[in-house]
């Protein structure tokens, strides 16, 4: 609850900046800092780099919100990079110790998945869900589910039509497909950055994981439909993209540092894996 309180206040700061209300910016900035300090004082064990009970949700949430800080001047929200790395290591170890399975519930699922994604742990996410055991989507499919079920094990008699386990969709679009709004008018591929509103300029940076050979999807924007279609075959990566009119795409091919900036149209890119 305290972490979500902090997140809400950070949104109020953003809203105040958007409308030019400097008084509210100062007021809520001070409040957010006090919340962050109180949160770390109450829940962080700096000796072990664990939050609360050390569960996946307990450690993922403060990493996601970038509120891990041991010291700092009032109004400074810069996370402690060293301490954050240690908490992330504990989080990864916990996932691995459970056989690459999650222990989070509905509230914590998104924070776990996105914390791992934003820190480059795409292979681990793939392992977490590419199986037919509970907890996992494959287990639901195994028992004939055509919509998300309320429980990971649909045999428990709960609802067979629940959206609350759908947080994986964000990883599908932002990472596997790789479509994200650009964070600035210049190129950016940092998944931790705050995105700009709209898709007049966007990033296509697909992540290749495991034995996944084919991904195709469309994304509807105010400017039109973005299409991404990629395949892996015999060591060759092929990417087809469709960029809507009056938009610009910044394309990153796996393994290549040089970006490709393209205007509206249809394009094909080929690269070695």
Task: Annotate each PLM feature.
Residues 123-273:
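Non-catalytic C-terminal accessory modules of carbohydrate-active enzymes
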Residues 4-160, 266, 270:
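Catalytic cores of carbohydrate-active enzymes
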């Amino acid at each position: 609850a305290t972490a979500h309180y902090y997140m809400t206040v950070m949104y109020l700061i953003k809203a105040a900046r958007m409308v030019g209300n400097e008084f509210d910016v100062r007021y809520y900035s001070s409040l957010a800092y006090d919340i962050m300090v109180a949160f770390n004082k109450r829940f962080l064990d700096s000796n072990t780099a664990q939050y609360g009970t050390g569960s996946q949700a307990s450690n993922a949430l403060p990493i996601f919100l970038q509120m891990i800080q041991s010291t700092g001047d009032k109004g400074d929200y810069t996370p402690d990079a060293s301490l954050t790395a240690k908490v992330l290591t504990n989080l990864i170890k916990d996932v691995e110790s459970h056989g690459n399975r999650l222990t989070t519930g509905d509230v914590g699922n998104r924070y776990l998945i996105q914390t791992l994604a934003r820190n480059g742990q795409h292979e681990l996410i793939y392992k977490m869900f590419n199986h037919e055991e509970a907890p996992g989507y494959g287990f639901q499919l195994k028992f004939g589910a055509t919509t998300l079920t309320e429980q990971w094990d649909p045999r428990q008699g709960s609802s067979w039509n629940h959206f609350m386990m759908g947080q994986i969709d964000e990883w599908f679009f932002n990472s596997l497909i790789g479509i994200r709004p650009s964070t600035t008018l210049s190129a950016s591929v940092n998944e931790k950055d705050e995105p700009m509103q709209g898709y007049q300029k966007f990033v296509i940076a697909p992540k290749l994981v495991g034995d996944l050979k084919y991904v195709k999807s469309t994304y509807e924007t105010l400017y039109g439909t973005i299409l991404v279609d990629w395949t892996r075959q015999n060591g060759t990566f092929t990417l087809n993209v469709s960029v809507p009119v009056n938009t610009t795409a910044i394309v990153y091919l796996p393994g290549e540092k040089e970006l490709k900036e393209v205007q509206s149209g249809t394009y094909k890119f080929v690269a070695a894996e």
